[in-house]
Amino acid sequence: LRAYARYLKQIRLGFDLGYIASTLNNHTDIARELTRLFKTRFYLARKLSAEDLEDKQQRLEQAILTALDDVQVLNEDRILRRYLDLIKATLRTNFYQPDANGQNRSYFSFKFNPHLIPELPKPVPKFEIFVYSPRVEGVHLRFGNVARGGLRWSDREEDFRTEVLGLVKAQQVKNSVIVPVGAK
């Protein structure tokens, strides 16, 4: 949940990390169900049949939506719904993949379908990967299946995604004759 909070900060949801954490603390029942949904999608998916997986996900989503009806503060409701949106928009993650020594990794990556994330700043890339660790965060935005681009260091901790999005837009224009989509 902490990694998703950092991503919410990058997509300009409008709430600071303290308020997001406070919201999760105020609604531990919903936070627990969000965590269960994440685990179902990315850990239990390897153990359940497609039908059982779909059924379990639908039940968890419905439980979360029902619990959200009792959230009285509009901003808290908005944050919790965005968590649900992010989990549903996550295509893949390395969260449950151990390192070479069988230990938990110190970093996580999430591949999103950004078109499933409401209110995302435009233009919306085709794919987005967010990397989180206590030491570093990063984002890779891609506007096509194949795209030119690379890595860039940013000292803009609060909004590096905005910087990268601007660079990708510029790269799309610059390289339109070569490859019609960009990435950073």
Please describe what each predicted stretch is.
Residues 2-184:
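Extended, well-ordered protein cores
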